[in-house]
């Protein structure tokens, strides 16, 4: 199957600056939804799908919009993996890896340790009266919890966080920066060594982890290693970034914060609205297996497309006042965790970690918590998006 390297007939060509997208992609996405919902973007080398309806359709038709994109950045970074498989091969890997991340397993196996990890991290900073909640809390919490669920007891939280940054930067390396590939290669080797050691240990002593589950489903070591790399990538940035974006929103909306503190059931709404408002994963690549018309454009077989989740989640035809953070908006399923057979495997882990533990603990424990407006906190990214830091102050005991 050949891969077209130019716009499909009838598709508008739109030049987008990647640096500007990293800074703030939403104005460009709004313009695309209005005037060019299926557009060829030369700087990305693919057609961008930016409307909710088209993205949802593509996610539900893997027989047309295949995850098995030839030469994808993810394949280059980690090798063959379940995110780039469809059909029986995807089901085989997902069935082996998913059980430890299901809601019941999260509650029964991991919730107690997650809570202890959150308390331990908060205890380290509680007496300081100031912190960067990303570097000092959200990222190490996501990393230590991920190591637990994966079974990587031979890796520290710092190891997992460093590996995740290397994987995610490479997965979004559309600029083809050689230094990015070098860091990813180093992380890849380290992950493979750690996984091989644990896989051997759990063969005789199962521990309920993802690696253990895959070993006892007779998945080959190389496949386990590749899929652990994938999970390490998304398993840190998604809970970290949802935590940071939602925390900052609440710090600037004390009325909402006070409501949620008084009615803890609302934390779930805060999570879903945060994931919609600033999606931690902004796009998914796909490749067409056959000619297909979508958004008024017939895309030929082989075409590479981007399902721009971050844009679909701001589609005004679906979400009224879509650019506004609003936990009271009428329920409509967002796209932040994907859909169809590729629905995010770690969604329930992230939901519990952030909405049941991290936010309630931070906002309940740190009195008079305020955003430090003098700090240079910024939001960045378009393939993946989140806060680089979140500096806060509070009244230390």
Regions found by a protein language model. Give the residues of each.
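Cytochrome P450
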Residues: 1-397
């Amino acid at each position: 199957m050949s891969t077209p390297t130019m716009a499909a007939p009838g598709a508008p060509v739109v030049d987008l600056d990647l640096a500007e997208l990293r800074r703030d992609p939403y104005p460009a996405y709004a313009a695309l939804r209005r005037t060019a919902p299926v557009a060829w973007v030369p700087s990305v080398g693919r057609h961008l799908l930016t409307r909710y309806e088209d993205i949802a359709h593509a996610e539900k038709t893997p027989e047309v919009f295949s995850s098995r994109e030839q030469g994808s950045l993810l394949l280059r970074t980690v090798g063959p993996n379940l995110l780039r498989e469809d059909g029986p091969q995807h089901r085989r890997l997902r069935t082996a890896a998913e059980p430890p991340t299901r809601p019941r397993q999260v509650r029964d196996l991991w919730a107690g340790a997650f809570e202890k990890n959150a308390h331990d991290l908060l205890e380290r900073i509680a007496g300081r009266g100031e912190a960067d909640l990303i570097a000092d809390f959200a990222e190490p919490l996501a990393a230590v919890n991920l190591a637990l669920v994966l079974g990587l007891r031979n890796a520290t939280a710092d190891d997992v966080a460093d590996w995740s940054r290397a994987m995610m930067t490479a997965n979004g390396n559309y600029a083809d920066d050689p230094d990015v590939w070098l860091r990813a290669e180093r992380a890849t080797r380290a992950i493979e060594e750690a996984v091989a050691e644990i896989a051997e240990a759990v063969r005789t002593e199962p521990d309920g982890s993802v690696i253990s589950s895959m070993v006892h489903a007779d998945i080959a070591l190389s496949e386990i290693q590749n899929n652990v790399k994938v999970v390490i990538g998304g398993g840190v940035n998604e809970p970290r970034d949802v935590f940071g974006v939602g925390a900052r929103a609440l710090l600037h909306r004390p009325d909402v914060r006070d409501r949620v503190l008084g009615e803890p059931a609302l934390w779930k709404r805060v999570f879903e609205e945060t994931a919609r408002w600033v999606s931690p994963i902004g796009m998914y690549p796909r490749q067409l297996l056959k000619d297909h018309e979508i958004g008024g454009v017939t895309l030929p077989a082989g075409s590479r497309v981007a399902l721009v989740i971050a844009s679909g989640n701001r589609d005004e035809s679906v979400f009224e006042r879509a650019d506004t953070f609003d936990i009271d908006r009428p329920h409509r399923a967002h796209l932040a965790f994907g859909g169809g057979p590729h629905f995010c495997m770690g969604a329930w882990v992230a939901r519990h970690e952030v909405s049941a533990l991290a936010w309630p603990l931070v906002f309940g424990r740190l009195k008079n918590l305020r955003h430090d407006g003098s700090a240079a906190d910024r939001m960045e990214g378009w393939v993946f998006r989140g806060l680089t830091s979140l500096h806060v102050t509070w009244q230390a005991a």
